[in-house]
Amino acid sequence: MHSPSSTSFTWILITLGCLAFYASLSDAQLTPTFYDTSCPNVSNIVRDIIINELRSDPRITASILRLHFHDCFVNGCDASILLDNTTSFLTEKDALGNANSARGFPTVDRIKAAVERACPRTVSCADVLTIAAQQSVNLAGGPSWRVPLGRRDSLQAFLDLANANLPAPFFTLPQLKDAFAKVGLDRPSDLVALSGGHTFGKNQCRFIMDRLYNFSNTGLPDPTLNTTYLQTLRQQCPLNGNQSVLVDFDLRTPTVFDNKYYVNLKEQKGLIQSDQELFSSPNATDTIPLVRSFADGTQKFFNAFVEAMNRMGNITPLTGTQGEIRLNCRVVNSNSLLHDIVEVVDFVSSM
């Protein structure tokens, strides 16, 4: 049996460990080296899963990038978009900008499971999604960069905020600027570079029908739409056709992450209104030069995109003792107190 003195000493150690643990977390900042010791292979684990997913789903890289974008625009990059419905909150998956369009959730589940097997209770779902977005861009031909990490996961979802914050495909340029500025992305380069995420992936016909047939209730197509491209889109999305049919965002290189999106905008071949607004809106005096610059130089776009991604990834992140590290990205941990105790015991054991 343990003596009372040894038991007391053990609890003192645990208490000191708790204090050190929470003190270390409270000062946490996002850094690319966050998992260098605790989970050094996390990026490779994520990358390998995505490579495997691409064999059966060529759209998955674009879908994961979109998930990350829609996560960060709603209460910051906290993996709240991954949560399912509960009796306490409604899922963001049913928001107007996500319902029947956001995809890739099973892939994120598989990535998280693989990461958990390698590094239990270590890497948050928010960081898993952030790393997955970066790897997806690179696997599609885009830039590679070291992602600042150290985010924690939210304890709830924010359906109303998702409906309020997510930019819509019919937004005008002033509306786009307001939506981006609301979350701290107030530079024209943020808007133009991040919109370049539409250089790959697909969109449903239902989001462009008004542009093709009845723009602003005029009974006419959007006048900023290239007439040849208009006819191509009308063939793919007939007036009384299936509006769930998928159309490529980029008619030139639909599966490659490159700068052709901006070349398309210069030729009035942006698929959705909010894209073409960057070049054709009367208010586009500060975005047109950026579109031209990115169309002329891939590296200029890549550099601006990486900077904007890091700025977006830093929107009010949960760090330190905030939130939790979810074990299953779809649900909050069933007993957060027990989970905290396990984290503390692990920390003390490593001292």
Curated annotation (Swiss-Prot):
Residues 1-28 form the signal peptide. It catalyses: 2 a phenolic donor + H2O2 = 2 a phenolic radical donor + 2 H2O. One of its GO terms (cellular component) is vacuole. Its EC number is 1.11.1.7. Glycans are attached at residues 41, 85, 214, 226, 242, 283. The record marks 66 as: Transition state stabilizer. Disulfide bonds join 39-119, 72-77, 125-329, 205-237. It is found in: Secreted; Vacuole. Keywords: Calcium, Disulfide bond, Glycoprotein, Heme, Hydrogen peroxide, Iron, Metal-binding, Oxidoreductase, Peroxidase, Secreted, Signal, Vacuole. Substrate binds at residue 167. The active site is at residue 70. Coiled coil: none annotated. Heme b binds at residue 198. Its cofactor is Ca(2+); heme b. GO terms for biological process: hydrogen peroxide catabolic process; response to oxidative stress. Removal of H(2)O(2), oxidation of toxic reductants, biosynthesis and degradation of lignin, suberization, auxin catabolism, response to environmental stresses such as wounding, pathogen attack and oxidative stress. These functions might be dependent on each isozyme/isoform in each plant tissue. This is Peroxidase C1B. It comes from Armoracia rusticana (Horseradish). The gene is PRXC1B.
